[in-house]
Amino acid sequence: MSKQNELNARRKQRVRARIKKYGSGRPRLSVFRSSKHIYAQIIDDTAGHTLAAASSLDKDLREGLKTGADIDAAKAVGKLIAERATAKGVTAVVFDRGAYLFHGRVKALADAAREAGLQF
């Protein structure tokens, strides 16, 4: 494993440990960012199930997006994940940014999810 990959894995582990310690049993909104797309899942760690998921690859979003790798796509995914979560009865979550900095696409997704009704 390269040094950078090792550091990213450590940061991801550290963030997840803090979430589990202070999350108080709420589901977590996990974000994965690739070079071409962005993905979001709401995961119930106590049961080990994914409650809702959305990505820039969803048919609902693909037609309206220029690309899946920009801030507009992240905002659309954030809004969609919030709508799907509230439909399942989830209103409060813990944001899991993983190893990513809270900046750019990750921040845009979080802000859009907050505006659409998720609390974190």
Swiss-Prot record:
The keyword Cell wall biogenesis/degradation does not apply. The keyword rRNA-binding applies. GO terms for molecular function: 5S rRNA binding; structural constituent of ribosome. It comes from the Bacteria. InterPro entries: Ribosomal_uL18_bac-type (IPR004389), Ribosomal_uL18_bac/euk (IPR005484). GO terms for cellular component: cytosolic large ribosomal subunit. One of its GO terms (biological process) is translation. Keywords: Ribonucleoprotein, Ribosomal protein, RNA-binding, rRNA-binding. Pfam families: Ribosomal_L18p. Belongs to the universal ribosomal protein uL18 family. This is one of the proteins that bind and probably mediate the attachment of the 5S RNA into the large ribosomal subunit, where it forms part of the central protuberance. Part of the 50S ribosomal subunit; part of the 5S rRNA/L5/L18/L25 subcomplex. Contacts the 5S and 23S rRNAs. HAMAP family: Ribosomal_uL18_B. This is Large ribosomal subunit protein uL18. It comes from Rhodospirillum centenum (strain ATCC 51521 / SW). The lineage of its organism: Bacteria, Pseudomonadati, Pseudomonadota, Alphaproteobacteria, Rhodospirillales. The gene is rplR.
